């Protein structure tokens, strides 16, 4: 793919521009305009405002009914960058997860494929807000799907990638490409549980309904539930908020417990959701207080489809060479909202080695520009193999 290599400098500079001008989830207005402008320049049909700030590019060639989708995320994180290079972030947030590179890499493939021969339809999904949810608790992928992106832009298969610092793939640092059959990444749910009691003076607890005591019982019950009823899932209490540090004689009205749950089975995540609600309501009833359980995040496990996996595996071996691919690495307990696409359409998710960079979400992280060529080559191979005559 010599012509692809000739595009490297152009998209390296584009990646640096996107990095320097990051935008948070559902606010990727300028990034989306840039993506749309580039796709139009390359000859794609362009559809904007899908999933609020998402963009879809469509390229049809030949007469085949076959179709394939590729996805990249566009949003940045609310982190102050600590790098001092010339293209460091300007906006008080930063691309600390490499979505600048994902976007530039898919655009690089888009330009290459615009001049390639294939038979079918290519749909490119540039997604907002992988890192956050909107007021309806919908992430960017979920919002695009709710906006009927997959109904309007039908695909037989959909594929996505993420860069991964080698330090986060211990034991596989020398590989370029990582993918596994079945469960790739965990699903995640987050909860805020508010116990509303009756505050008062610490000298008269009998006149109060102490929410701290109730919330403490709830936390203990959660960890008992965790040890007795869960198999592969991880449940952690990550916050306990109550009272004030400005006085010692006040029993507060409310106590809040924050919970993070990660699991490899969507069925078990649903079971955990049911049990958290049951336990919270049961303890609140036992101590005669009120309780509100709010789910703050709900991302399903990322599960690679077997059929799509076989297609992706062949493309990866062609792109990287079999010795540079790892197909048996352990699943990760991190989560990825690409799972929403995989819940609707056959597809796979994979990692590409970002080399010796700082870890994801670190203020000194930077996307490795060499991954632009690796990602665009993999994406292009997927398309040309599947949409061949």
Regions found by a protein language model. Name each.
Residues 69-71, 191-193, 349-354:
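Non-cysteine beta-strand/loop elements that form the S-adenosyl-L-methionine
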Residues 212-389:
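Metal-dependent amide/peptide-bond hydrolase catalytic core
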Residues 21-26, 77, 132, 244-248, ...:
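Short, small-residue-enriched loops and turns at beta-alpha junctions
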Residues 84-94, 100-101, 116-236, 240, ...:
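Histidine/acidic-residue-rich, glycine-tolerant segments that coordinate divalent metal ions
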Residues 18, 57, 70, 99, ...:
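Divalent metal-coordination and catalytic microenvironments
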Residues 1-95, 100-120:
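Acidic/His- and Gly-rich active-site-bordering loop/insert found
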């Amino acid at each position: 793919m010599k012509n692809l290599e000739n595009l490297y400098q152009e998209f390296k500079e584009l990646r640096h521009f996107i990095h320097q001008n990051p935008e948070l989830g559902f606010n990727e207005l300028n990034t989306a305009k840039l993506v749309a402008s580039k796709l139009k320049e390359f000859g794609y049909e362009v559809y904007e405002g899908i999933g609020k700030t998402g963009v879809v590019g469509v390229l049809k060639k030949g007469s085949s009914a076959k179709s394939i989708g590729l996805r990249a995320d566009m949003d940045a994180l609310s982190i102050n960058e600590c790098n001092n290079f010339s293209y460091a972030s300007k906006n008080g947030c930063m691309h600390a997860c490499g979505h600048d590179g994902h976007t530039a890499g898919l655009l690089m493939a888009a330009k290459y494929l615009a001049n390639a021969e294939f038979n079918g339809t290519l749909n490119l999904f540039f997604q907002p807000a992988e890192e956050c949810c909107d007021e309806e608790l919908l992430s960017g992928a979920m919002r695009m799907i709710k906006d009927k992106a997959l109904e309007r832009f039908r695909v037989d298969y959909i594929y996505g990638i993420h860069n991964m610092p080698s330090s986060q793939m211990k034991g596989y640092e020398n590989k370029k490409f990582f993918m596994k059959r079945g469960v790739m990444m965990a699903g995640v749910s987050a909860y805020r549980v508010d116990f509303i009691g009756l505050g008062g003076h610490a000298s008269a607890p009998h006149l109060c309904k102490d929410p701290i005591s109730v919330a403490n019982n709830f936390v203990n019950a959660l960890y008992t539930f965790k040890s007795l009823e869960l198999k592969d899932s991880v449940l952690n209490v990550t916050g306990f908020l109550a009272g004030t540090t400005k006085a010692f004689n006040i029993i507060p009205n409310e106590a809040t417990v924050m919970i993070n749950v990660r699991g490899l089975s969507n069925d078990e995540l649903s079971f955990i959701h049911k049990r958290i609600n049951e336990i919270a309501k049961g303890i609140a009833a036992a101590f005669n207080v009120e309780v509100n359980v709010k789910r703050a995040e709900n991302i399903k496990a990322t599960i690679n489809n077997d059929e799509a996996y076989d297609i992706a595996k062949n493309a990866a071996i062609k792109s990287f060479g079999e010795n540079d691919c790892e197909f048996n690495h352990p699943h990760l307990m991190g989560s990825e909202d690409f799972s929403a696409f995989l819940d609707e359409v056959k597809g796979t998710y994979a990692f590409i080695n970002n080399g010796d960079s700082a870890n994801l979400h670190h203020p000194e992280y930077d996307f490795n520009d060499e991954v632009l060529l690796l990602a665009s080559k993999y994406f292009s191979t997927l398309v040309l193999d599947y949409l061949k005559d």
